[in-house]
Regions:
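N-terminal alpha/beta PP-like core and its mobile active-site loop of ThDP/TPP-dependent enzymes
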Residues: 1-260
């Protein structure tokens, strides 16, 4: 057990998960924690509008494979994240969504800029949880990040603003990573037979390739089969467009080569 403030516990969990970048706008509901970012090696990217922060977090993760955090002031600031969070949800992008809330003692009584932030994002995240006890700050944050990574989608932690600067005595929770398993031997054998007998195989790459971390394997398969590769809607990131076998995206805005 170790004594620390709730914001110190929050930052220590971010560090354990390797989160190095946060995007958005920090208001009074999150200021106590932002002072700890520089020493913790976390870069905060201040933006002109909250939507920009969410879009940048989505793009950062899709281009690097590393999870990021987006943040805004409770109430009107948080509502600015609706579009990018829903976009990240459909893009299958793991993301930590931090939503500071009105003070605990004022929730439900028209607290400062109070908005029902859990209901707002309930169909845009794979998991959401509100901190109901300051001593569980690290536990809840750790669980939310794990859910975002496992679900490959945004996950939300809702934190009452008066839960910062609380002194707690806790042990930091362990990180539990689940290994992604490959296909079974029988399924792989059937797939190999289908591909070997195909007259003109075409590969459609999409979210599964990204989530499975299989971009390099997809390149090798395409080269072995000499097969053109088209990318699913919103997932040009699943196959490098500079590759000679890449023919572009599928969908209403797809390339002519794909349709042909």
């Amino acid at each position: 057990m170790a004594k620390m403030t709730t914001e110190e516990a929050f930052v220590k969990v971010l560090q354990k998960h390797g989160i190095q970048h946060a995007f958005g706008i920090i208001g009074s509901a999150f200021m106590p924690i932002s002072d700890l970012f520089p020493k913790a090696g976390i870069t905060f990217w201040d933006v002109a509008h909250e939507s920009n922060g969410g879009i940048m977090a989505d793009g950062y993760t899709r281009s690097t494979g590393k999870i990021a955090m987006c943040i805004a002031q409770n109430g009107p600031g948080i509502t600015g994240l609706v579009t990018p969070i829903k976009t990240a949800f459909w893009n299958h992008t793991p993301m930590l969504l931090v939503t500071p809330q009105a003070a605990n003692k004022t929730i439900g009584q028209g607290g400062f800029q109070e908005v029902e932030q859990m209901n707002l994002f309930k169909d845009m995240v794979c998991y959401q949880e509100e901190v109901r006890d300051p001593s569980r700050m690290a536990e809840v944050l750790n669980r939310v990040i794990e859910k975002a990574i496992r679900g490959s989608a945004p996950a939300q932690i809702n934190v009452p603003r008066d839960y910062w600067t609380q002194v707690i005595d806790i042990e930091l929770p362990p990180i539990v990573r689940l290994e992604r398993q490959g296909g079974g031997a029988e399924a792989i054998d059937k797939a190999a037979k289908l591909l070997s007998n195909a007259k003109f195989p075409v590969i459609l790459s999409g979210a599964g390739v990204v989530i499975g971390g299989a971009i390099e394997e997809t390149k090798k398969l395409a080269e072995k089969l000499d097969s053109p590769v088209c990318s699913g809607y919103q997932h040009n990131d699943s196959f490098p467009g500079s590759h000679p076998l890449a023919v572009g995206p599928l969908g209403y805005n797809g390339s002519k080569a794909v349709w042909n």
